[in-house]
């Protein structure tokens, strides 16, 4: 192996920051799309009795309430998970006690 190929091989371990940022953004987009899909499916099943040319006021109110509850519940779960992780001791620390 010559010096140019060995230096490029050594660089394979480093991730391009722009590529890493792009992947993070795309992953966030995917997660958001999954949440929207879950919310749409859940609220559609709950609120839509029979599809028609126009959304009636009862169904509209149901959709609004469903979306708000979905967001509230998702936020509650995220907050609870954060609290749980913060209160847990690090695994290696708990073994040393």
From Swiss-Prot:
One GO location term (cellular component): mitochondrial intermembrane space
GO biological process: nervous system development; protein insertion into mitochondrial inner membrane
Regions annotated as coiled coil: none
Membrane topology of the entry: Peripheral membrane protein
Source species, domain of life: Eukaryota
Disulfide partners: 43-66, 47-62
One Pfam family cited in the UniProt record for this chain: zf-Tim10_DDP
Cellular localization per UniProt: Mitochondrion inner membrane
Chain positions found as Phosphoserine: 57, 87, 94, 96
Chain positions of motif Twin CX3C motif: 43-66
Main location: mitochondrion
Keywords: Chaperone, Deafness, Disease variant, Disulfide bond, Dystonia, Membrane, Metal-binding, Mitochondrion, Mitochondrion inner membrane, Phosphoprotein, Protein transport, Translocation, Transport, Zinc
GO molecular function: identical protein binding; metal ion binding
Entry keyword annotation includes Nuclease: no
Assembly and oligomerization: Heterohexamer; composed of 3 copies of TIMM8A and 3 copies of TIMM13, named soluble 70 kDa complex. Associates with the TIM22 complex, whose core is composed of TIMM22.
Written domain comment of the UniProt record: The twin CX3C motif contains 4 conserved Cys residues that form 2 disulfide bonds in the mitochondrial intermembrane space. However, during the transit of TIMM8A from cytoplasm into mitochondrion, the Cys residues probably coordinate zinc, thereby preventing folding and allowing its transfer across mitochondrial outer membrane.
UniProt disease link: Mohr-Tranebjaerg syndrome: An X-linked recessive disorder characterized by postlingual sensorineural deafness with onset in early childhood, dystonia, spasticity, dysphagia, mental deterioration, paranoia and cortical blindness.
Family: Belongs to the small Tim family.
UniProt-recorded name of the protein: Mitochondrial import inner membrane translocase subunit Tim8 A
Native source species: Homo sapiens
């Amino acid at each position: 192996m010559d010096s140019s190929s060995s230096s490029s091989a050594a660089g394979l371990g480093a991730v391009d920051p722009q590529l890493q940022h792009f992947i993070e953004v795309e992953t966030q987009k995917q997660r958001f799309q999954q949440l929207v899909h879950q919310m749409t499916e859940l609220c559609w099943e709950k609120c839509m009795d029979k599809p028609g040319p126009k959304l009636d006021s009862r169904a509209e109110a149901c959709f609004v309430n469903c979306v708000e509850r979905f967001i509230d519940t998702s936020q509650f779960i995220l907050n609870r998970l954060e609290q749980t992780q913060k209160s847990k001791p690090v695994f290696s620390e708990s073994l040393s006690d």
